[in-house]
Amino acid sequence: MKETEYKRHRLADLLLVLLAALFCWCALQGTLDLNPQGIGMDSDLQNYAQIMEAGECPAAFARDPVASFFPQDPGVPNLLTALAGLLPDGDNAATDMLRVGALGVFLHFLAYYILGRCLFRSPSLAALLSILMSIAVHWSFGTFWGSMRSDPVPRIFYADLWPFLLLLACAAVKRPSLQPVVMFLSGCAMLVHTVSALMGGAMFFMAFFLLWRDRGLWRHAGLSLLNLLSFAVPVVIYLKVFLADTPAPPVEYAGLFAEVRALRYSKDWHDVWQSLADILRYYTFPVPLFPAAAVAAAILFKKRQQLAGPVRTLLRLMPGMVLGIAGGCVLCALEMWLARHLGRQNMSQEILRGTRFLVPLSWLLLTCLLSLYWQGVAPLLRRGLVILLAVVLLSLGQGKQVVAARHALADMAGLGWLDTEEARQIKAHSLGLRDALQALRAQAGPEELVFTDGDCMAVRFAARMPMLPVHKDGNVIYYAADPDMARRWLAMQHRMAADATGYMEVWRTEQAALLLTRHVEHKALLLRYGALLFENEDWLLLRRSPVAADADAQVTRSGYAD
């Protein structure tokens, strides 16, 4: 009987892995069709793509005022960009990252399925956990949990690694000698994703710190110190190797760079603690994820003797991991307070994005609660529930991966009803921009700069054209600590924010002769300052006329524009 069950489980494992691989392959094919050359993909990936393209083709960006600062971006390299650089030549760096990202999505399904199999043994419950973990859950600070929402970004690889760190941490509960190993690997995860690794380290440290029972005070203190050092050593090495060359903003320009940072991150960081409180409140009342997890935790602790051994071990880590997140927030608040009183920029704000780990901890608690009753449900019903959840998510899910997978399947099978209106809109916008970029390449002179009033970084990574700084470039401008570029970027952003036609003033007074804009409604007004080179439903491409350029140069010399 056991042999039959073993074979059935192995067959289920193989089937689920193949289905996950098929979904990820369809999502990749759909994404490559919806976003040719990466055009229109996630803006973080666009930023990485332009940095990689500038590194591979420096001559093409010799006149780009920002490209020389790209090496100062602390977000590059990361595991995603490093793996993308190893792929055989694709269309460009953007498509290479999309291919690596598809691997990340597949590993996400696989990692949480393995975690579920180790905790519960049941393939159906493991599949349920894997599906729950993939669901996109919005969080504060411009981040989210899950693998389905957008094009895969670097943090997905830490999410792939985290289940294995969690399993190793469970093993370390009974074998304390493994605790420093877990902490050391958590520190090494800085190479994967820095923000996640720092909050992950706090979670594991506090989880181990609370495991003091049956251990003398001094022995426990010594082990805790060793855990802390095991985590700190790789973190410090990472900071020294990868961030030591990042210049600090000059003290006399502290206010200038504070303004750059505030403007660049105004959308995600306008009110840090209120934003965090709002999202905690949202998942407490309108969407009761956290109350459900708390109830699950209470039931699990009450019935812990009925739990499987691995689940009982995981439950011992849970309180410490939640307290680790809280402790990480307290340390961030303290550092931010000190930075404000010392008149410098804080360094810990980004770590608060790691509070999103409250979501997977909640999913784990709810799935552990299900494990108490799962075996009492008829096998056919168990499998049916998992299949039903998967079908509902594939049918109703609005995440980019689901939309792309359905688009690819509709295209390959000739089933138009499978496609979505969102996919059709994404493709139409991407093709419209691709046509505009092709016209830009054909029309641009060898020494001409491009100006675009949106974050159209495809000018750099798809058309390989030098471009004036866009809003997203504020990040690297902040870390480059160049006062002149900071002033220039701020002036451009303020002029564009002043009114709907502010971008025209930037185009007329800056060095870029070419304008690529989505403001097709301003066509008549724009033709007063330049010649139309290309247009479609979404984009206009113009070259500034020499007369307008001379007039604006005279205005600038008179002091009016300044």
Predicted features along the sequence, with ranges:
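Start-transfer (signal-anchor) and selected internal transmembrane alpha helices
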Residues: 1-31
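Signature aromatic-anchored transmembrane alpha helix within multi-pass, membrane-resident enzymes
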Residues: 17, 229, 372-408
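Active-site lumenal/periplasmic loops and adjacent helix-entry segments of GT-C-fold
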Residues: 23-133, 140-163, 191-198
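Transmembrane catalytic cores of multi-pass membrane glycosyltransferases
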Residues: 27-46, 54-77, 194-201, 208-359
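Transmembrane alpha-helices and membrane-interface helical segments
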Residues: 110, 114, 164-171, 203-211, ...
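Membrane-interface transmembrane helices that cradle and orient dolichyl/undecaprenyl
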Residues: 157-181, 215
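Short periplasmic/luminal acceptor-recognition loop of GT-C membrane glycosyltransferases, typified by
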Residues: 423-494, 503-523
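Aromatic/acidic, Gly/Pro-rich catalytic loop(s) in extracytoplasmic/lumenal soluble domains
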Residues: 501-562
